[in-house]
C-alpha cells in the first residue's frame, strides 16, 4: 500500500514553510523541524520536544521522514567508505566518502544509472532507470553524516559535497537544486557554496539556470580538447559542442573573481593523453578562470580503455602548468572497493529505459546553434 503522507525529506525550507502554512502553523516551525531532521538526525516526530504535542500528532498523521536503506558498506584500505543504498523500486545507487587530512568529501549520486552514456564510465554502461527524488539525494548526506558522526573536536567529518556520483545532476535539475538548498541552509547542513560542487557533462541551458538560482562551484566533465574526440567520449557534445560549453562556463564565472571552473579530464592511454592534446586544451581554456583535474582512468569490466601511465600523465600536467593552467592529478582513492571515479555502478532493475529516455531527453533539450 502506498503511503500518502508527505515525506519531509523532499522539502527545503521554502517547501516546509508552505507545508506548515497549510497546517495552519507559523513558518518558524520549518526551521525547528529542519534542525531536528538534518542536524540532530531525528526521524520520530514524537521526539521533537520543542513542538507541542498536538503538532507532533498531526505530523505523525500527515508526514513521514523516509530515507534510503543502507544495504552494504565497504571501507577501503585508504579510509574511503562506499555505501550501497536501496531506493524506492528496489534499485540501488552508490555513495562514496573520501577522507583527506582535515577535509572529508562526500560524492553523491543524482540518478539511478545515467542517461548520458559516456564511453569511459561504468555508470553510463550499466543502464538508466530514473531521477532520484530530493529525499534520495539529501538522504545520502543524511545517512553518511549520521553513520560517520563527528570528529573528537565535535566537528562534522563531512566538510565538502560533490555531485559527482551516478548520473548527470543537471538532467535532474529541480530535485538537485532543492537538495543543494538544504546543503547550504544554516538550519540544515550549513555548507558554504565553496564546499558544494556540481559536475556536469555540459548541459548548457541548465548551467545558465543553475547560475541564476544556486551558483555552487561548477565542474565540467571535459575529457577532450576537440569536438571530434569529445563526440566519441561524451555523446552530449553533439548537442552542445565545445564553443557553446566554454561560453556557458565564462558566463557562469562572470563578475566574480573568486570563481573558477574545474575541468575534469580522464587520462585514456593513446586516446587523449598526448602533448598535442595538452596544447589543444591550453588553447581551448585560454582566458577562462580554470583548474584542471587529471583523472587516471579507473578500469571496469567490459571497458576498451586503458589508464595512461604515470610518466605520460606527468608530462601532460607539466605542459598545462607551463601554459599557466592550475593542474593537479587526482589521487586514485577507493579503487580496491570499486569506489573510484568512473567505477560507480549501483544496481538498475530496468536497463531497457536508457535509450528511450536518452532520446526523449535529447529531443526536449534546446539545440545549440553550432551543433550539426
Swiss-Prot record:
Compartment(s) where it occurs, according to its Swiss-Prot or TrEMBL record: Cytoplasm
UniProtKB keywords: 4Fe-4S, Cytoplasm, Disulfide bond, Iron, Iron-sulfur, Metal-binding, Methyltransferase, rRNA processing, S-adenosyl-L-methionine, Transferase, tRNA processing
4Fe-4S as a keyword of this entry, yes or no, is: yes
Active site, UniProt feature = 94 (proton acceptor), 341 (s-methylcysteine intermediate)
Q: Which reaction does it catalyse?
A: adenosine(2503) in 23S rRNA + 2 reduced [2Fe-2S]-[ferredoxin] + 2 S-adenosyl-L-methionine = 2-methyladenosine(2503) in 23S rRNA + 5'-deoxyadenosine + L-methionine + 2 oxidized [2Fe-2S]-[ferredoxin] + S-adenosyl-L-homocysteine; adenosine(37) in tRNA + 2 reduced [2Fe-2S]-[ferredoxin] + 2 S-adenosyl-L-methionine = 2-methyladenosine(37) in tRNA + 5'-deoxyadenosine + L-methionine + 2 oxidized [2Fe-2S]-[ferredoxin] + S-adenosyl-L-homocysteine
Gene Ontology terms, MF aspect: 4 iron, 4 sulfur cluster binding; metal ion binding; rRNA (adenine(2503)-C2-)-methyltransferase activity; rRNA binding; tRNA (adenine(37)-C2)-methyltransferase activity; tRNA binding
Q: Return the PROSITE patterns for the record.
A: RADICAL_SAM
The UniProt record gives the binding positions of S-adenosyl-L-methionine as 167-168, 199, 221-223, 298
- Chain positions recorded as [4Fe-4S] cluster binding sites: 114, 118, 121
Stated EC number for the protein is 2.1.1.192
Q: Does the keyword Lyase apply?
A: no
Cross-referenced PANTHER family, in alphabetical order?
Answer: 23S RRNA METHYLTRANSFERASE, RADICAL SAM CORE DOMAIN-CONTAINING PROTEIN
UniProt lists the family membership as follows:
Belongs to the radical SAM superfamily. RlmN family.
**The protein's name:** Dual-specificity RNA methyltransferase RlmN
Q: Which lineage? A: Bacteria, Pseudomonadati, Pseudomonadota, Gammaproteobacteria, Chromatiales
Amino acid at each position: 500500500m502506498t503511503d500518502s503522507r508527505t515525506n519531509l525529506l523532499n522539502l527545503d525550507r521554502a517547501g516546509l514553510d508552505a507545508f506548515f502554512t497549510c497546517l495552519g502553523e507559523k513558518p518558524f516551525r520549518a526551521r525547528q523541524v529542519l534542525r531536528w531532521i538534518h542536524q540532530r538526525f531525528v526521524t520520530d516526530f514524537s521526539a521533537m520536544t520543542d513542538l507541542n504535542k498536538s503538532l507532533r500528532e498531526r505530523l505523525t498523521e500527515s508526514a513521514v521522514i523516509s530515507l534510503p536503506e543502507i544495504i552494504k558498506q565497504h571501507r577501503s584500505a585508504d579510509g574511503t567508505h562506499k555505501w550501497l543504498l536501496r531506493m524506492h523500486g528496489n534499485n540501488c545507487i552508490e555513495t562514496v566518502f573520501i577522507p583527506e587530512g582535515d577535509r572529508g568529501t562526500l560524492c553523491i549520486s543524482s540518478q539511478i544509472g545515467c542517461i548520458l552514456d559516456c564511453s569511459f564510465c561504468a555508470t553510463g554502461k550499466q543502464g538508466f532507470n530514473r531521477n532520484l527524488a530530493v529525499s534520495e539525494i539529501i538522504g545520502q548526506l543524511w545517512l553518511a553524516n549520521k553513520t560517520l558522526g563527528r570528529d573528537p573536536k565535535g566537528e562534522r567529518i563531512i566538510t565538502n559535497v560533490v555531485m559527482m556520483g551516478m548520473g548527470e545532476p543537471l538532467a535532474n535539475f529541480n530535485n538537485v537544486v532543492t537538495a543543494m538548498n538544504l546543503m547550504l541552509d544554516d538550519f540544515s547542513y550549513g555548507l558554504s557554496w565553496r564546499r558544494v560542487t556540481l559536475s556536469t557533462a555540459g548541459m548548457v541551458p541548465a548551467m545558465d539556470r543553475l547560475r541564476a538560482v544556486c551558483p555552487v562551484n561548477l565542474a565540467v566533465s571535459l575529457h577532450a580538447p576537440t569536438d571530434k574526440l569529445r563526440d566519441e567520449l561524451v555523446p552530449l557534445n553533439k548537442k552542445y559542442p565545445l564553443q557553446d560549453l566554454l561560453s556557458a562556463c565564462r558566463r557562469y564565472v562572470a563578475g566574480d573573481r573568486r570563481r573558477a571552473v574545474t575541468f575534469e579530464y580522464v587520462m585514456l592511454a593513446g586516446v587523449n593523453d598526448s602533448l598535442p592534446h595538452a596544447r589543444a586544451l591550453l588553447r581551448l581554456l585560454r582566458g577562462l578562470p580554470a583548474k584542471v583535474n587529471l583523472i587516471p582512468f579507473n578500469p571496469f569490466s567490459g571497458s576498451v580503455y586503458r589508464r595512461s601511465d604515470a610518466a605520460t600523465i606527468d608530462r601532460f600536467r607539466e605542459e598545462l602548468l607551463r601554459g599557466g593552467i592550475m593542474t593537479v592529478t587526482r589521487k586514485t582513492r577507493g579503487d580496491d572497493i570499486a569506489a573510484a571515479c568512473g567505477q560507480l555502478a549501483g544496481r538498475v532493475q530496468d536497463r531497457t529505459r536508457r535509450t528511450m529516455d536518452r532520446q526523449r531527453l535529447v529531443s526536449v533539450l534546446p539545440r545549440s546553434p553550432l551543433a550539426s
